[in-house]
Every structure is written in structure tokens, then in C-alpha cells.
Amino acid sequence: MTNYYAEITGWGKCVPPTVLSNDDLSTFLDTSDEWIRTRTGIENRRISHVNTSDMATVAAQHALARAGVEASEIDLIIVATCSPDSLIPNIASKVQQNLGIRSAAAFDLNAACTGFVYGLETGTRLIQSGNYRHAIIIGAERLSFYIDWAMRDTAVLFGDGAGAVILSRTEKETGLLQSQIGCDAKGRDILSVPKFGTCMDRFAEDNGYWDFNFVGQEIFKRAVKGMGLAAKTVLKASQLTTEQIDVVIPHQANIRIIQTLCDLSGIPQDKAFVNIQNYGNTSAATVPIALCEAVEQGRVNPGDNMLLAAFGAGLTWGAAVLKWGDRVTPIGESDAALPECEQSALELLERAIKLCNERRRDEV
């Protein structure tokens, strides 16, 4: 029986053009650039003027071009997201439609910030079954939709964006070599949007509002523990030492979490690719965006051993060891882009900020 692997042959990202800076946030929140940077490492984040599926499509188009794979060759699409345009149907089918793919398996996957690692594991195993040849794995989020812009602790953290990779079937030992995904359900309520879904009263007067539960200190402890243990497990299973890991692509949630993860794993911090300063926490999109930029910036070389680690609501966690293939140079490039946005980030958010603050005043 042939042993198949799933090599990453293409990579792409899509970040909205509109930037929301820390200074912008300080115009309507009790915060400052220094306060945010020293606690999170974040300087800017992007605010989308389009739907999640639009960003996912552009990221996929760039990944396809760089892989040299035609859309018609794709037979599997997985979109990791917790902020889809619609619940029914899934947005993987919308991406499929946008790309002009007539027939492919297409589904969404919600594991919050760990979603891309879950998707990478799922896509790899399906390709290894021998039933699929090329897959698009996407992490895409429009988290600005959920944010209570009157709550400083969460409003400063999140942003919008999408990243994608193409997985291609090969007999070379490359791609995902070891992975571990899991969930610590005892802590599911400390990071949640609890009243969004069928549990909400759809006829309530204020059903346009919902809480974003975020217990920062507890999340920090569980994130470091979950990602750290998973990282050690996959390193041991792959029979690699920390010295043999060339690049770490961590979930970009907080610079302190990234630094602590490296310290606990015994991996030098300079091996970790960090771009949280530019985009904030884009949930399932952080890992593929970081992976794409690491390749673009020359941080990834042919044959490199890579460690991916993520943690998210649920509380989901995961880590993976990847071996990069022989190519870091794109086969082609795409000119795909989002439509221009003539509004600033503050203009895009003006109504949401106003209504969130009115709600808080009414509660007092």
C-alpha cells in the first residue's frame, strides 16, 4: 500500500487594507499605545469591509497561483472559521463558488483559534486516504463583527484576515509528520460568545448584542499549558530535538504567550515568527498568515522542520511538526485583491462603537 503525504505547495494571505491603530483605539477607549503594546505586543489590527468568505477567497487565489495548481484540480476545501458569513450554508461552498470549482468536498470547521491546525490535520489525513489529490486549507476570520467596542480588554486584541495553504498529495515524506489536537472543555466558558446561536432569544429586543467572555489570566495559564504539552508531545513523537526545529509558527494571541511557549519548550525565542504587532489576534487566520509571511520573508528554507502551535476557545489546543518541501519560490503569482475601501477603520466602526457604548450606559 502506498504511503501518501500532504505537502504544502502554495501559500497565500489576505489582510484588509484598513488599519485600526492603538492610537485609534485610544480615541474611544481608556487606553494608550503603550498600555496595549506592553501587555500584548499589538500595535495595529485590520478591520474588514467585506465578508469572511471574500478574504478567504483572495487568500486561496494567492495560494493556488503559488502552488501552480488550477482551481479545477482542487477536490477538497476546508475553511476554519468561527465568524462565517452565514451558518447555512457553510462558507467553504461560497469560496468554492467564487473560485469556479464545480465539484469538491467543502466544509467549515470551528475550533476557534486552533482551527487552522485542526484543518491541517483533517486535510492531511483525507489526502493520505488516497481519495483526494489537492486541498485548500483556509483560516479566515472577521472578528470585528463580534467585538464589544466598549470593552477595552477584548477590543484591543482582535483583528480580521485570512490565510491559506494548498496541500498536494505526494509520496515524499514531507508536510505534516506529527500532530496532536485536543480540547480542555472544563474551561470552555472563560473564552466564549455564549449567547450567539440557537440558545439566543431571536425575538428579544436586544438580540443584536451579545457578551464576549474573556478571562485573561486564566486563558494565559491554560494556553501556555495546552500548547506547551502538545508541542512536547509532537516533538517526542517525531523524534526531533528542539535544536532540530528551524522555525516556530505560533498562534499570535499575545507576545507573552509566544515567549513563554518557547521558554517552556526549550526553543530559542528568535526561532518563533511573530507578526502580532501588525494584525493582532485573527483567531484561525493567525497561523496561516504567519506561515505565509515567514515564507515570503525568507524565514523558511527547503527541508526545514517547523513547529506549529495554537490555542483557542473550547478550550481547543493543538501542535504539529511539519517538514517543508523542496520549494520556497512561488510557481506563479495572483493579482487577486479585495475591493478598495474609502472609509477609515474608525468610520467603518462608527455605528458599532456608538451602539456598544449606548448599551453599556443603559446597563449602568
UniProtKB/Swiss-Prot annotation:
ACP-binding: region residues: 252-256
Catalytic site: C113, H251, N281
Gene Ontology cellular-component annotations: cytoplasm
Record keyword rRNA-binding present: no
Pathway linked to the protein: Lipid metabolism; fatty acid biosynthesis
Residues passing through the membrane, by range: none
Catalytic activity reported: malonyl-[ACP] + acetyl-CoA + H(+) = 3-oxobutanoyl-[ACP] + CO2 + CoA
Cross-referenced Pfam families: ACP_syn_III, ACP_syn_III_C
Keywords: Acyltransferase, Cytoplasm, Fatty acid biosynthesis, Fatty acid metabolism, Lipid biosynthesis, Lipid metabolism, Multifunctional enzyme, Transferase
Gene3D superfamilies: 3.40.47.10
EC number per UniProt: 2.3.1.180
Cellular localization per UniProt: Cytoplasm
Molecular-function annotations in GO: 3-oxoacyl-[acyl-carrier-protein] synthase activity; beta-ketoacyl-acyl-carrier-protein synthase III activity
GO biological process assignments: fatty acid biosynthetic process
Family to which the UniProt record says this protein belongs: Belongs to the thiolase-like superfamily. FabH family.
Subunit note: Homodimer.
Function text: Catalyzes the condensation reaction of fatty acid synthesis by the addition to an acyl acceptor of two carbons from malonyl-ACP. Catalyzes the first condensation reaction which initiates fatty acid synthesis and may therefore play a role in governing the total rate of fatty acid production. Possesses both acetoacetyl-ACP synthase and acetyl transacylase activities. Its substrate specificity determines the biosynthesis of branched-chain and/or straight-chain of fatty acids.
Domain remark from Swiss-Prot or TrEMBL: The last Arg residue of the ACP-binding site is essential for the weak association between ACP/AcpP and FabH.
HAMAP family: FabH
Protein name (database record): Beta-ketoacyl-[acyl-carrier-protein] synthase III 2
Organism expressing this protein natively: Vibrio parahaemolyticus serotype O3:K6 (strain RIMD 2210633)
This protein's encoding gene: fabH2
